Amino acid sequence: SYNNKELEDLILRGQSTDKLYKKLSRNKRFMFDLNKVMGILHSVSKISELYDLKSLHYEPLKYNLSGFSSVRIGYTSKYRLMFIEQEGGISIELINISEHYGDK
């Protein structure tokens, strides 16, 4: 499910009115990687499987982002997809795409 209408538009329609997402929607490599990540998230049966996919750099977040998790979008991308894991399976509530703090 989506907690962000602009993110939903980007993922489902490849377009958005949000400044960052609009810029990203024009990047073909990013959109390819985003679609690949979304396919992986839909295909795993439990969150623990994401640890096995090293290229995603899956991590539960800490400190002020505690309660959220993230995966990297693409191998060399500075962007990550943040989400909330739900109890009872792989139901994921997508929150946003952000620049990873360690990549400049």
Where are these regions (language model features)?
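Arg/Lys-rich, positively charged N-terminal/basic patches that mediate binding to nucleic acids
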Residues: 1-39
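Residue-level marker of positions within ordered structural domains that often coincide
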Residues: 12, 46, 88
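Short, charged helix-to-loop "capping" segments that act as catalytic/coupling loops
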Residues: 12-17, 24-25, 52, 64-66, ...
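A short, surface-exposed loop/turn module that caps and links secondary-structure elements
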Residues: 43-71
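Enriched for short, Lys/Arg-rich terminal
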Residues: 62, 66-104
